[in-house]
Amino acid sequence: ETVSSLRFTGPETYEAVRIEDSGASYSSEDVYFKKDEENLLPLDPVQVDEYIRTLQNLDLSDYASYYVSEEEWSTYGLDAPELSLEADYTFENEDKENVSGTLTVSVSRDPKEKEKAEKKENSEENSGEEEEITAYARVNNSQIAYKLTAEDYKGLMAMKYDDLRHKEVFWGDTEEITGIDISLEGADYSLTSKGKKDDRTWTYQEEEIETDELFSALKGLKADCFTEEESGQKEEIRLTLHLDNEVSPQVTIVLYRYDGSSCLAEADGKTVSLIPRSQAVDLIEAVNTIVLGNTED
């Protein structure tokens, strides 16, 4: 079974589509995208596949009511759902024919419980106790109200763009990187390579180098939270990655100082996230190991 589209109406309203060979991402693994007017914004395929599995494996064994009249849906908050989603899917039947369909699911938390939780949130009261969640769902135009598990409710509500997008600052294949230009503390360095993919040899100042720690630190740059805030502080490190990639021949990543615990990450001139400062330190140390190591030799 293949899900070709997810349309969300709720905390955020948007459509996620499945497109292979889209030309909209430097990663060939990216097949899911958020439609943003004329643009396609890459989504993390692992996160989207997990969301689809949650949808496919919903526990609908607990009936809150076998029959709900139109006037009674408000009892379950499903007269105005917190979230409505439509999933377009295709599967192959027993006759090897492709069959298409659309699944519609409406989700809401118990209205009284939701109101109580919102008041508690607004008052900033936090007892530290695990919150009890009672939630309901309606599937297609059924008159049945299903009681959802707390896990399924949380899984379905984790549908925002920030829930499903890539957490990594760079999520491409490091084997496609052919060269790296680095600016650090006012000095510029260039790492070059020869060969293809996993048979690539890296050099700095004509000396062969190991890049495992550098690439591990690069892939380790992951968002604590997403932001569009612009930095007015010091640039910590800048890397321009040259890629063997027709979609994006190069990607520029800049990390800026933010505070004692975080750095602001920018990709191709656009702020994307706040990352732990420790991750920036790991990257800087990996670069210094290469460039200072060669200088000492």
Language-model-detected regions and their locations in the chain:
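Secondary-structure "cap/kink" motif recognition
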Residues: 1-297
